[in-house]
Amino acid sequence: MNSMSFLISTLFDLYIMVVILRIWLQAARADFYNPFSQFIVKATQPVIGPLRRIIPSVGNIDLATVLFAYVLCVLKFVVLILIASNGSVSFSADFLFLGLLSLIKAAGGLLFWVLLIRAILSWVSQGRSPIEYVFHQLTEPMCAPIRRIIPAIGGLDLSVLVLFIGLQFANFLMGDIIGPIWFQL
């Protein structure tokens, strides 16, 4: 059962990251004509399209997509418990709380990976990659304020490193507040 749980958890996590990327692309007003953005939109549109007709947006927040990401996180735990318990599960409010925690952790994990890929691409492609352009649009609102406080030293931008440290601190802080379950999400 561990192999099945791993596979299902990974598939859920990957799709949750794609849905969170869609939310982030909209919030950052990133280039939607970019090939990477088009992939994200096409991968989520079959579900998000009908949901957006039912659930309206609130300001810049696409509530339908946020709700869908949350439901996916809750559903992930329900399915994993079903597998672990051989098909019997009683729904609990704990699933709702775990879903929220999982969504928060997935967003932080996605930020980490986007920052890491952006840093690597900045050394390799030097601005010629369409993915790098979108990742720059996504992360620049977080890097720019840090860059005002800590300017580049010798041409080396430390804002991404500061964000990495901040993300790790937040991760360990959540582990201290919530307990060991945070690291198992």
From Swiss-Prot:
It is a multi-pass membrane protein. Keywords: Cell membrane, Membrane, Transmembrane, Transmembrane helix. One of its GO terms (cellular component) is plasma membrane. It is found in: Cell membrane. Its main location: membrane. InterPro entries: CCB3/YggT. The keyword Transmembrane helix applies. Belongs to the YggT family. This is Uncharacterized protein in proC 3'region. The lineage of its organism: Bacteria, Pseudomonadati, Pseudomonadota, Gammaproteobacteria, Vibrionales.
